[in-house]
Amino acid sequence: MKENWYMFFKMLIKHEGGFTDDERDNGNAKGDGHGNKGSTMLGVTAWTWAEYTGKPAPIEVMKALTEEDVKPLYKKNYWDVVKADNLPSGVDISTADMCVNAGPSRAAKILQKSTGGLTVDGAIGKKTIAAIHDRDPKEVLNNYYYGRQKFYESLDDFEHYGKGWTRRNKETLELALSIV
């Protein structure tokens, strides 16, 4: 839902935190595509920022990013991509957060599995949106939580990042259920 965008962004920034250039983080592995070392600021990787702006994203650029800088990127590249304005309240936040964390296709597939009876194609279209609106949003959200957690636990780096991913998943579910 359109009115949940700001609530989502506030939660997202809390989860994504500040600057990191942790080489174990897959998001930092590619660098920025212009020969600069990979880094992440407010959850935005150097690669993503360079793609979004069309300019190199060296560490000094990444460290200078503000919430206001990254807000339009999150709206365009994540919230809008999963059509969050068209999703039920709560489902929008969970789906958009997973889109940031694991990409739009993964977020859509988990949503489609959570809804049941849908072709799992990784794209949120009219059929997916209609099916979600026909389901109990609390049931969809709980299914989404378990699908998301199963995905995290399947990752090789769950041992290192799993505690944070699990906390994020739980906090996202709690917020989402509170606005259904």
Task: Please place each PLM-identified region on the residue numbering.
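Cell-wall polysaccharide-cleaving catalytic domain and substrate-binding groove, primarily
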Residues: M1-V180
